[in-house]
Each structure stands twice: as structure tokens, then as C-alpha cells.
């Protein structure tokens, strides 16, 4: 009698050029977050401006990078994985992403034009913070995979 074998579906795959593909959700993530790319913390406003610069330069060949939604940022939080943040603290994020990232992630969601949502990878919680505050601010940028993209 044959045993049932469960094969774990691979959620992410590395695509090269610092890109991680998540085919099941139609997303492409940057392997490094904005802190790792720039070696500095950013406010939500600075992150928005940095994304515009990356899009002008077509980072990894694409011009439609953005901050993740809160739901997308939260989706990277997975207690089945163990990675390390900038301070060397345990963070439940897949190790396909480069260790040493910021544990607070700016998202695309804002309220009252001065506050933005940050997702905290250490505890898996969201908070509102001043969009002009740089304190440990970073973001893992993402883009939607388009039909014309070659992601092989």
C-alpha cells in the first residue's frame, strides 16, 4: 500500500537581480528592503520618493515598484520560518529574504495624510506612525506581476 506523500509547495522563488517571485499571489518582491538597499532608515515620505527614483531607473528592469499593502506585508510574517532583523533579533520571515532587514515595514496605507501603517515583523502587529518619522523606517518593496513579464 502506497503512503500518501505531502509535497510542500514552494511559495517563493529567487529570480535573480535581487528579486523574489511569489507566483501564487502574482507578486514580485525585492530580496532586500529599503534599509538594506540604502543603509539608512526612511520616513514613509522618503520611502515614497525613493520608490519614484527606483521606478525612474527601472530597478531590475521594472518601473512599477510600490510599498506593500498591509495585507501583503503581513503575508510575509510566517511562524514556520526564522530570519534575523537588523538588530539580529528573530523575525518569522522566510530566509529567502536577506537577513538584516528592518523589522518595521512601511505600507501603502495612510490616514489623515500624516500617518501611515507600519507592520512589525517581530510581533506581527500593525501600528500607525507619523509619515514623516524616520525612526527605524524601512519597507520591502513589491510589484504586481504583469502578463508580459518574463518570470521564468
Range-by-range predicted roles:
Residues 1-66, 71-152:
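Glycine-aromatic-enriched surface loops/turns that form tight recognition elements
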Amino acid at each position: 500500500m502506497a503512503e500518501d506523500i505531502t509535497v510542500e509547495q514552494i511559495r517563493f522563488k529567487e529570480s535573480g537581480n535581487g528579486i523574489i517571485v511569489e507566483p501564487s499571489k502574482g507578486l514580485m518582491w525585492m530580496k532586500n528592503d529599503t534599509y538594506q538597499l540604502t543603509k539608512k532608515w526612511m520616513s514613509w515620505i522618503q520611502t515614497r520618493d525613493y520608490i519614484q527614483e527606483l521606478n525612474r531607473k527601472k530597478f531590475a528592469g521594472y518601473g512599477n515598484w510600490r510599498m506593500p499593502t498591509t495585507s501583503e506585508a503581513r503575508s510575509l510574517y510566517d511562524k514556520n520560518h526564522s530570519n534575523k532583523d537588523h538588530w539580529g533579533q528573530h523575525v518569522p520571515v522566510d530566509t529567502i529574504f536577506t537577513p538584516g532587514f528592518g523589522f518595521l515595514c512601511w505600507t501603502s496605507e495612510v490616514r489623515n495624510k500624516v500617518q501611515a501603517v507600519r507592520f512589525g515583523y517581530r510581533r506581527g502587529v500593525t501600528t500607525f506612525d507619523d509619515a514623516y518619522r524616520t525612526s527605524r523606517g524601512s519597507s520591502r518593496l513589491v510589484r504586481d506581476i504583469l502578463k508580459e513579464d518574463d518570470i521564468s
